[in-house]
Amino acid sequence: MSSDLLCGSHAAPVVTQLRRHAPLVHCITNDVVQNFTANVLLALGASPAMVVDTDEAAQFAAIADALLINLGTLTRPQQQAMRAAIDSACAAGKPWTLDPVAVGALTLRTEFAQEILARRPAAIRANASEIRALTGESGGGRGVDATESAHQAREAARLLARRTGAVVAVTGEVDYITDGERTVAVEGGTAMLTRVVGTGCALSAVVAACCALPGDRLENVATACWLMKRAGEEALTVSRGPGSFASALLDNLHAQAFGGAYETH
């Protein structure tokens, strides 16, 4: 399966739309990453909100421009709020994104992820092991970490996209984004992104924000991946370790959104 390579010149129009529309993203995400996720969205010009009560989640999902469902610290009571929010978003015509953290490794979240896939997410952002688990392959990573490369899960991602109608982003050293017919690759980034808690979960929130934008959803989701990788590369050049890298990542995401300079490679 061949993949087209996304470069900065293709990402630039999507970044402009992100800044212009400033989508309101309803994040039902895990307890570990809420603050960092909110700051990443703000850095890019989007607006985050974390509404978790079941009744309020349903109300707010209809108001927001996009919804993120992240299974990182899933509990049975939280499932009710997630179902209500997804149903409300779907009824209002709002896109929702699934981040199926650690599916395949744990039973509760794996069964719940399979259940809500029937509600047709606009996008799915996951690592290789999670993508393979969603398709019923062996899957099952080491907790939240993948035990396979994104390249190994490209075909599973394509099949999952065809089955669900979602744009599927399988992320790793190289990210692959597919709608089941077309596939885009995003290269770059840095291993330091794996040394800061929440970068993957925050990326899923950016994917959700980009799903609210007009235009080609495949390119929109690929641009979300490009933004995180590019900002990570730039942050690495000015940081001394994970702590300073996290701050520099936010600064460089903001620079990508508001600086207006995009390389063609």
Swiss-Prot record:
Record flagged with keyword Amino-acid biosynthesis: no
Keywords: ATP-binding, Kinase, Magnesium, Metal-binding, Nucleotide-binding, Thiamine biosynthesis, Transferase
Required co-factors: Mg(2+)
Entry-linked Gene3D superfamilies: 3.40.1190.20
One Pfam family per UniProt: HK
Binding site for ATP: R125, T171
Catalysed reaction, written as an equation: 5-(2-hydroxyethyl)-4-methylthiazole + ATP = 4-methyl-5-(2-phosphooxyethyl)-thiazole + ADP + H(+)
Any one GO BP annotation for this protein: thiamine diphosphate biosynthetic process
Matching InterPro entries: Hyethyz_kinase (IPR000417), Ribokinase-like (IPR029056)
Stretches of the chain forming a coiled coil according to its record: none
Pathway involvement of the protein, from the record: Cofactor biosynthesis; thiamine diphosphate biosynthesis; 4-methyl-5-(2-phosphoethyl)-thiazole from 5-(2-hydroxyethyl)-4-methylthiazole: step 1/1
Positions bound to substrate: M50, G198
Entry EC no(s): 2.7.1.50
MF term (GO), any: ATP binding
Family, per entry: Belongs to the Thz kinase family.
NCBIfam families in alphabetical order: PRK09355.1 (NF006830), thiM (TIGR00694)
Function statement: Catalyzes the phosphorylation of the hydroxyl group of 4-methyl-5-beta-hydroxyethylthiazole (THZ).
HAMAP family the UniProt entry points to: Thz_kinase
Record protein name field: Hydroxyethylthiazole kinase
Organism placement in taxonomy: Bacteria, Pseudomonadati, Pseudomonadota, Gammaproteobacteria, Enterobacterales
Originating gene: thiM
